[in-house]
Amino acid sequence: ADEFPDLGGASDIFQTLRAVLFEANLGEVYDRLGDRRDALLKDTVRWNVELARRLTAADVGRALRGRGALQERVRLFFERFDLIALPTVQVLPFPVELDWVHEIDGVPMSNYLEWMRSCTDISVTGCPAISVPFGFAPVDDGAADGADVPVGLQLVAAPGHELLLLQVAHALDGDGWLTRRAPVDTVAR
């Protein structure tokens, strides 16, 4: 089916709650490092801690309420469907020298999480998810020396349906994916 649950707000919810977790787990380390933090902490770690420190209790409350509403929309979706299938990430594998993808198809990413929204948005739902290899896509930008690169298919099930998810993933994994090639027009760049 061409239907998909409404994940509106998922990106902001994810970023807010992730930042709070970074502050809770690494805020003390961030403070102790003082002037050395730029040299010793990855910029994305600093970004999360600093984001958390700019948030208000109202911001966190909105994120928690938003997550509850989003999870309810997804629960209702799963009353009609068994699984969601979507690309694991929005881009093909990129050079290891890049920390993260800064632009997709001419659209700038505002932070290091946006290039993987198809994963982070699903994380907010609280649903079990798995990524399975699902063939290869040709790359014509010279970055991969003309070799095809692997693509993943993300499968998502309703909470409590982990067995179904694993059964479908196992069936797909044993289905000769190594010989499949994805059509270029179905893979976001």
Give the role of each language-model region:
Residues 113-125:
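Hydrophobic alpha-helical segments in the ANL/AMP-binding
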Residues 50, 61-64, 72-75, 80, ...:
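Structural helix-boundary/capping segments
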Residues 16-75, 91, 131-150:
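Short helix-loop capping/hinge segments that flank enzyme active sites or metal/cofactor-binding pockets
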Residues 47, 71, 100, 115-118:
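Tryptophan-centric aromatic hotspots in well-structured domains and transmembrane helices
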